[in-house]
Structures are given as structure tokens and as C-alpha cells.
Amino acid sequence: MLTTEIINEAVTRALHEDAPEGDITSNHLIPADATAVAELVAREPGVFSGGEVFAAAFKLTDASTAVELKIKDGEPFVAGQLLAVVTGNARAVLTAERIGLNFSQRMCGIATLTAQYVAAIAGTKAKILDTRKTTPGLRPFERHAVVCGGGHNHRYSLSDQVLAKDNHLAVLTRGGKDLTTELKRVRSEIDPAIKFEVEVDRIDQIAPVLAANVDIIMLDNFTLDELRTGVA
């Protein structure tokens, strides 16, 4: 979940990374009392995400900066649309702009691409879910963006759900373990409220996994024909 605390921590870290000793260009070139008005305008159509994060970049640089968001997370926008207006001390605005843009561009990009996938499966019972293959340190932001695009979050971390992947299964089979027996053992050991998912990459793995009464079977790298067979 993307909380204000998570946002402030990540944005503060990013601001320090970008200007550890301050913005020496703006501080020397721009008068201390100069003010500026900046507009965030879309170059391409998309789906918005990260408004609070964008605003935090400016607010954490100078609390007196005013950020007016013209759009909400999850809403679509068109090329040329005004998305936000920033008003404040010119030095502060110039110092924070790249961090604000870095977060908003990445999050809008993920939301926009997710929305395209969601549109592609419209009218079916399928759902678009994300994965743990996120940028280190940015997982809450990227997963929030997926939801903004109409997708759904899968397990958040290794602690949330049992997901036996191909490498887990490989260790078991190489050790001479019976797959169904081992999966049933895990099912009996974990809290019934915890989802139990197993990833398979071959058709012949489906039957022994089904016999273990797991909640979800992930078909990994299947061709379309293999998917049809596996689902049937």
C-alpha cells in the first residue's frame, strides 16, 4: 500500500540523492526571492498515477510551494492536457522538478501500459496481475500504478503468500520427493487463510499439482495452444 510515510521517505531519499549539497546552479543563478509557476503538461495520452508523489517532491523541498493537481490517479488524459500547476520559490521549484517528473513519468507509464493490457482482455473473465519483478525500492509506487491502470496486485512479498515456483519444484524432484505429497504437506502446515499457488512450466506438472488441492496454478511460459490445453 502506498502510504504518505512511504512516499515521503522515498522522495526525501531521491531529493538527497539528486542534490546532496543543494542545487548549486539554481542557488547561484536564481535570485533568492524569485518565484516561478510550472505546469505539468502531457505530451502523449495516457493514464495518470502518482499525483501525491509528484506534489511531495515540491512540498518536501519547500513547504510553502503550492501544487494544484488537475487530475486524479487512475484518470485518463490526452496529449496537451494540463495535469498539474506548481507555484512557489523559483529555486525550490527548479530543485524539485526532476524528482517530481521522474516519479510521475514512471508511474504514469506503468498505469498507461497496464490500461492497454486491461483493454485487450475486456469482456473476458481474465484479470491483469502484477509481479514482484519491481524496481528495488519502488515496489509500492509501481504496484500502485498498476492498480491505477485497472490491474490488480498479486502477492506483495515473499511473506504474504506461498508460491512454489519452478526452482522450488526442481529442488524437490531432484531430491527424489513426490510433488503431490510435498505440496499437501505444505498445505497442511500453513494457515488456511494463506493463498497457496504453484507455478508449472509443463503440462505434465498440472495433474500432480491439482491433486494437492492448491488455490492457484500459474502456467509459466506456455504457448497459446498449451494454455488452452492446461486450462481445459
Language-model-detected regions and their locations in the chain:
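Short secondary-structure boundary segments
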Residues: N221
